[in-house]
Design a protein with these regions (language model features):
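Conserved coupling/interface region of RecA-like P-loop/ASCE motor cores
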Residues: 1-37
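Core RecA-like ATPase module of SF1/SF2 helicases and allied nucleic-acid translocases
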Residues: 4, 48-232
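Short, solvent-exposed polar/charged micro-motifs at secondary-structure junctions
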Residues: 6-11, 36-42, 91-92, 115-116
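Alpha-helix boundary recognition
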Residues: 14, 43-44, 221
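Interdomain hinge/linker elements that couple catalytic modules in large macromolecular machines
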Residues: 21, 29-44, 49-58
Length: 232
């Protein structure tokens, strides 16, 4: 119990939960520093970067892929995250593919999925990335990933087309591409329930009250099990 109480991460999380002022610090396991001191070294050091908004997520994913020497298109070895539950897609171990699962893109190839022309839609095909998704618990094979989500951060299929295709699933199969994004930086919302050794948190100010902000920040810092850098 004493060791837990002495943890810098726990001390910081308690201060946040109690809405006490957070001071800059340079501890052994926790560093709280101004956001303008962010560096490429910090981004590459972290096991996981956490942000508050999708805009920041898209920005830092692009920056980190550039730092790693990756090009515009998705590449083998890219870190990606699943954005929805796909209960019918099972890994080799029999585990369903669920929202928030982080893993590695394997063997990506550009592809195309066609759907019936009687569907009311601007086009009658989806551009996809056919790939395997490798996770700690197993590999999901031959997934058709939404290419637009990875390249632009936008869905290729709007809700009207998705609704029509969903009603025809038993007849034509599941043709809607699966929604994945790069996972180098993710939102705190997607990080709930997960934990990493080294975490970098980019604090953001939101238009909600102090209590709600404290809850968000508490969730963010407690994702770190060993070392934490909080930029604010």
């Amino acid at each position: 119990m004493r060791q837990a109480e002495d943890s810098e991460i726990i001390q910081l999380s308690m201060a946040i939960r109690e809405c006490r002022p957070i001071e800059y610090m340079d501890g052994q396991n926790v560093k709280v520093i101004p956001k303008d001191q962010i560096s490429t070294g910090m981004l590459l050091w972290a096991d996981q970067v956490l942000v508050g908004t999708n805009k920041e997520r898209y920005k830092y994913n692009a920056q980190m892929r550039s730092l790693l020497g990756r090009g515009k298109d998705p590449e083998d070895g890219d870190k990606i995250i699943c954005l929805h539950n796909y209960w019918e897609d099972l890994s080799a171990a029999g585990d369903p593919l669920v929202n928030g699962t982080i893993g590695t893109l394997r063997c990506p190839q550009p592809g195309r999925v066609d759907f019936p022309r009687f569907i009311k839609a601007p086009t009658h095909h989806f551009d996809v990335i056919n790939a395997n998704f490798e996770t700690e618990d197993g590999t999901y094979h031959c997934l058709n990933l939404d290419q637009d989500m990875l390249l632009k951060g936008t869905k290729c299929c709007d809700w009207r087309v998705s609704y029509q295709l969903g009603k025809l699933k038993n007849r034509i199969g599941d043709v809607i591409p699966k929604e994945f994004e790069y996972g180098y930086a993710i939102t705190v919302h997607k990080a709930q329930g997960s934990e990493w050794d080294k975490v970098l948190v980019l604090e953001e100010q939101f238009p909600f009250d102090k209590i709600e902000h404290a809850r968000w920040l508490y969730t963010a810092v407690t994702r770190a099990s060993d070392k934490l850098v909080l930029l604010r």
